[in-house]
A protein has these predicted regions:
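Short beta-strand/loop motif that positions the catalytic acidic residue
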Residues: 194, 202-204, 208
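Active-site glycine-rich loops that stabilize anionic/oxyanionic intermediates
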Residues: 19-22, 86
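Active-site loop/oxyanion-hole signature of alpha/beta-hydrolase fold enzymes
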Residues: 6, 29-35, 41-84, 97-98, ...
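Flexible "cap/lid" loop of the alpha/beta hydrolase fold
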Residues: 93, 97-98, 103-136
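Alpha/beta-hydrolase fold catalytic core
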Residues: 1-15, 35-39, 77-78, 108, ...
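Conserved alpha/beta-hydrolase catalytic His-Asp/Glu region
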Residues: 117-123, 136-193
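Gly/Ala-rich beta-loop-alpha elbow adjacent to hydrolase catalytic centers
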Residues: 84, 88, 92
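Catalytic histidine-centered segment of alpha/beta-hydrolase-like enzymes
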Residues: 234-243, 247
Length: 259
């Protein structure tokens, strides 16, 4: 399997997992901020960027976690600080739940909790709507429609342009595979399996209409000892929208986790 990625810096690895309508390059400001202290690695998930698709038609969160394990092995990363955003949270939580010895800390941002607990009819409707938008509009058209909803009311035009750029680059098959995974996963089941000793934090925006604050709080509620932080005014794409505040929260958390 081929995986495209961005890498910068030396030291303890910090691994970044993007969301369903995104790409490794969306983390460029996070990478730049942390490269002086960490070896920062952001992958393009399977089916994104130049990464090959997963071989199964409807991969599970476990399949993405397995792919991440292989990728990290190839990178020589035995353990890391792990961060997931949105759909990336599902991959990160599954990886941490099944390979806790490889995770030094876990940060979940703008949590996509998964839809496994919804009625089957509702799950299928949401899946059809998501895949249907991409089929009807194409990646660029979908980005024009969806990207504005990922930002808070005070977001800059630059943040919107960056969102449209990454969302407009998705590949339909990889996006469809990720959408199926979202439809069949329950992140709480994985979070409940995390070892109590694992440092964890949740970061979310109070203006997020994609994964609303209560959804993030619900996940935090089943994660004993987790630190939960809200960024006022931030929408779903909080690390693009308010990079200074986001990076400060992450830096403070990592400082405590490595002390």
């Amino acid at each position: 399997m081929t995986v495209s990625f961005l890498e910068q810096g030396q030291g303890t690895p910090l691994v970044l997992l993007h969301g369903i309508g995104s790409a490794a390059r969306s983390f460029d400001r996070v990478i730049a901020a942390f490269a002086p202290r960490f070896r920062v690695v952001a992958w393009d998930a399977p089916g994104y960027g130049d990464s090959t698709d997963l071989p199964m038609e409807h991969p599970t969160a476990g399949d993405y976690a397995d792919a991440l394990a292989v990728f990290l092995d190839e990178m020589g990363v035995q353990s890391c600080h792990l961060l997931g955003h949105s759909l990336g949270c599902l991959m990160a939580a599954r990886f941490a739940a099944t390979r806790p010895e490889r995770v030094l800390s876990l940060t979940l941002c703008s949590i996509a909790a998964g839809q496994a607990n919804l009625p089957a009819e509702e799950r299928q409707k949401l899946l059809d709507q998501r895949i249907g938008d991409l089929a009807a509009l194409g990646p660029q058209g979908m980005a024009e429609k969806r990207a504005p909803r990922l930002l808070g009311p005070a977001a800059s035009p630059e943040a919107l342009d960056r969102l449209k750029d990454t969302m407009g680059s998705v590949r339909p098959h990889g996006y469809g595979q990720a959408a199926h995974m979202l439809s069949t996963t329950d992140i709480k089941a994985d979070v409940r399996k995390l070892p109590p000793s694992l440092p964890g934090q949740v970061i979310y925006g109070d203006a997020d209409v994609i994964t609303p604050p209560e959804r993030n709080r619900d996940v935090a509620a089943v994660w004993p000892g987790v630190a939960a932080h809200v960024i006022p005014g931030a929408g779903h794409a909080l690390y693009l929208e308010q990079p200074g505040t986001f990076n400060a929260l992450l830096a403070a958390f990592l400082s405590k986790s490595t002390s």
